[in-house]
Amino acid sequence: TQFYEHCPPFVTAESIRDDMCALPQRKMDEPQDKYYLGFFDDAEQLVAVMDFIDHYPTEQSCFIGFFMMERSVQGHGIGSRIITELCVYLHSLGYEYIRLGYVDGNKQSESFWKKNQFTDTGLRNHTQDYTVVVMNRML
C-alpha cells in the first residue's frame, strides 16, 4: 500500500504480528490499551483498519498509530465518516484530543488528516528511514 512506500519495510506476516504488539515506551506495561480496529461495510467486507492506543500521550487523549483504507473505497468519504464518528464518540467519553503522525512526504495522508481537522503540532519524530509529522485534533 501507499503507507509502505513512505514507511518501509514492506509488510510481512511477522511485521504485522510485531506491530500488533508495539507500544510506546511509556505504555509498555499497559498492553490492554492497544487496539486494532476493523471497519466493515454493509456486505461485511473489511474496508479499513486502525491501530489505536488509548490514553496516550496523556490520560485524556488517544493515538492513532495508522489508519488504512481499502483502495477500492478511497475517495468516497468513508474514511472521513469513520474518523468523524470516532471523534464524536471519544468526545462523548471526555477525551480532549487525538494525536497521530504521518510520514513526511506522504501527501495523501497529509491531505486526508488536514481535511479531517487535524493540525500540525510542529513536533517531528525522526527515524533512520523517515520523519514523522505529529498532528492533533482537539475534540
Identify the meaning behind each predicted range:
Residues 86-90, 98, 109:
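Short hydrophobic clusters on alpha-helical segments that form packing/core surfaces
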Residues 80:
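Residues forming the Rossmann-fold NAD(P)(H) cofactor-binding site
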Residues 100-110, 126-131:
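Conserved beta-strand-loop-alpha-helix junction that forms the acyl-donor binding cleft
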Residues 70-72, 76, 104-105:
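Active-site acidic-Proline motif in GNAT/NAT acetyltransferases
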